[in-house]
Amino acid sequence: MAQVDVFKKLVSHCKEYGFVFPSSDIYDGLGAVYDYGQMGVELKNNIKKYWWDSMVLLHENIVGIDSAIFMHPTIWKASGHVDAFNDPLIDNKDSKKRYRADVLIEDQLAKYDDKINKEVAKAAKRFGESFDEAQFRSTNGRVLEHQSKRDALHTRFAKALNDNNLEELRQIIIDEEIVCPISGTKNWTEVRQFNLMFSTEMGSTADGSMKIYLRPETAQGIFVNYLNVQKTGRMKVPFGIAQIGKAFRNEIVARQFIFRMREFEQMEMQFFVKPGTELDWFKKWKEIRLKWHKALGFGDASYRYHDHDKLAHYANAATDIEFLMPFGFKEVEGIHSRTNFDLSQHEKFSGKSIKYFDPELNESYTPYVIETSIGVDRMFLSIMSAAYCEEQLENGESRVVLKLPAALAPVKLAVMPLVKKDGLPEKAREIMDNLKFHFHCQYDEKDSIGKRYRRQDAIGTPYCITVDHQTLEDNCVTLRNRDTMQQERVAISELNNIIADKVSITSLLKTLQ
């Protein structure tokens, strides 16, 4: 099945089973804004707990804060967001659709990659075990031609970004004959910059109002509080501050479901280090963060690093961890060496010293910062897209199953009486009342046991237990595994011991040590 069809089915599945709803749905929705349903909020909370515990519990020198969404407007002037937080946009005159110029060119680069990979795949199939991929890539004429065009485009694109040359970005689109996905034409406007921050007014008109912004990132709330945290927590460099919170960007080209939204949630950690050590720490955090992603069990091939062609104004090194979504490799986390830009700017604009005094060196300095930043919603989408499976069973039936990591699943255990009589519901309720203190359980007695299994498969429940007539005699239940569908008879008294470790976030965290 084509990946685009899989993605459409996933979006439909998210709504049907209570993971994600279009916001304001009864009013025909609001563009690029979504609500998380009863299953989605549980999965999202589990993702956040996995991240938070991996940062704050596993690292003695990382603590958390929760800063306000509204902040003094000068903060955004100091950070560069007022002047430089822009996207290069281009319109197609025929479809009237607006696109990010850089994304159109990145998609063109991806097409060259696809052409090369198709040539490699065909050759691998033709030559079998004797196939030498490295030699083929370096000698095959078609591959070399595609690679040459890609390299030339990449070089030209990177230079245009670094020079902030909007005319050159448009010329690249024209020269590459990039067409509008809607109209299929090459009738493009000029490229222009668009600021992404939402603004509003604080205060009454009578008293004189102040223009403020909805924060476009959570990082600045950490920077302006870093010295408060350092002093009250008696923290020593290197140390980190973690935060989870909402951010807002007026994305003109919001697309791909919850991948790019106007209201979204971030998990960010700013790690403060001694100047001169930042690139070593940058490398270390790259490795730590990739290991965190891979621990979810979706396979090494699903991840890759992508170094930035153009560095942000605050960075001296930056990379993305990309995940293979149904629509290609896309960023789920950014790791940046932000230098001392933010702290120096806030010191300059506030007129207050926020230098750190290092007792070991007996000197004061402005720390450098390594940032790790995840979009919670993108992380949610990557997990859902990797977990979504349509399976054909041996008996000719089919099932849709979410093979979510057990520790992240919204519901850990479903408790089901075989029938709604003969004391089985009462026994099932008794079991659930004991287990619900340990993990999230769901009681289900409606429809046949087969239909109930399918419902639990569809929301990713790792385990189901069935209470039958024999249970009343031997105090044992049937335990079913979601992924294998295998069943075993286990004692009720052993259920917590058998299940708890497999579904706890603690077990996931232990793999990171």
What are these regions (language model features)?
Residues 1-513:
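NTP/phosphate- and nucleic-acid-binding module
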